[in-house]
From Swiss-Prot:
Principal place of residence: membrane
Gene3D superfamilies the record matches: 3.90.550.50
Keywords: Glycoprotein, Membrane, Signal-anchor, Transmembrane, Transmembrane helix
Protein name from the UniProt record: C1GALT1-specific chaperone 1-like protein
Localization in the cell: Membrane
GO cellular component, one term: membrane
Length: 315
């Protein structure tokens, strides 16, 4: 029979051990904020320099631009059904192909689990096996994300999809660096091929959660380590993130607060690819501002042109 003092001692030991583990693990969590530099094992991915294209004919550039084919995967759950309708009619039309997977209602996810990592694995495997030969880049985003596909293609223009690329907005979690799904995740065809092989192995990409549940984007990063691939943070030439995890209004508010003299420069990159946390109405506003509104007499001397798919009925 254990005495009351003995019971209290063991309880204290147990609580102390748990507290030490949690403090140790939480103490290792570091999130890289915009504008804050840290050393990484990999380089930061940046777009090509437009001067590199000046001596290349427009015909060749157009053909090269057509060779970049992006498959968009909209993955997630939304209580607001209008998201799906707006997504179909706005930025996803600029993808070479886009499919929307509602993790709550889609038949593809008729599996014995509500686990987001299992659902993400299912989506990636399904897309690659069905479309892997026809597209060289695969972009996964949440229903609340707005993406500028032309800027994504510009970032990828000089990248070889036969190499394993895993890029977006990187976050550090303990010893793990991963691309957060809130900013969108980009995988090259070669990496999708490797991931597909890994997913056939139930052990290498199994659920890695131990004390608490790990999110699907962290699980993906752990899985991709088996392919020898690490996350890459995408930036412009000013070092600003191009995959944003917040809505543009919030980024502007932060810039006004932090540096009111340079709001435009401090807010966002002019080559931004994603913004997250948008309502369906805000997505419509973004579409108007990006593709409809024109400043009379202002001419953008862009070297490259990325045209939306034929029949997209979208500028």
């Amino acid at each position: 029979m254990v005495s009351a003092s003995g019971t209290s001692f063991f309880k204290g030991m147990l609580l102390g051990s748990i507290s030490w583990v949690l403090i140790t693990m939480f103490g290792q969590i570091h999130i890289r904020h915009r504008g804050q530099t840290q050393d990484h094992e990999h380089h930061h991915l940046r777009p090509p320099n437009r001067n590199d294209f000046l001596n290349t004919s427009k015909v060749i550039l157009l053909e090269l631009s057509k060779s970049i084919r992006v498959f968009c995967i909209i993955f997630g759950e939304s209580e607001d059904e209008s998201y799906w309708a707006v997504l179909k009619e706005t930025w996803t039309k600029h993808c070479d192909k886009a499919e929307l997977y509602d993790t709550k209602n889609d038949n593809l996810f008729n599996i014995e689990s509500n686990d987001r990592w299992v659902q993400m694995r299912t989506a990636y495997k399904y897309v690659f096996e069905k479309y892997g030969d026809n597209y060289n880049w695969f972009f996964l985003a949440l229903p609340t994300t707005f993406a500028v596909i032309e800027n994504l293609k510009y970032l990828l223009f000089t990248r070889d999809a036969s190499q394993p690329f895993y890029l977006g907005h990187t976050v550090i979690f303990g010893d793990l660096e991963y691309v957060t799904v809130e900013g969108g995740i980009v995988l090259s065809r070669e990496l999708m091929k490797r991931l597909n092989r890994l997913l056939d192995n139930s052990e290498t990409c199994a659920d890695q959660s131990v004390i608490w549940k790990l999110s699907e984007d962290k699980q993906l990063a752990i899985c991709l380590k088996y392919a020898g691939v690490h996350a890459e943070n995408a930036e412009d030439y000013e070092g600003r993130d191009v995959f944003n995890t917040k809505p543009i209004a919030q980024l502007i508010e932060e810039a006004l607060s932090n540096n009111p003299q340079q709001v435009v420069e401090g807010c966002c990159s002019d080559m931004a690819i994603t913004f997250n946390g948008l309502t369906p109405q805000k997505m419509e506003v973004m579409m108007y501002g990006l593709y409809r509104l024109r400043a009379f007499g202002h001419y953008f001397n862009d070297t490259l042109v990325f045209l939306p798919p034929v029949g997209s009925e979208n500028d």
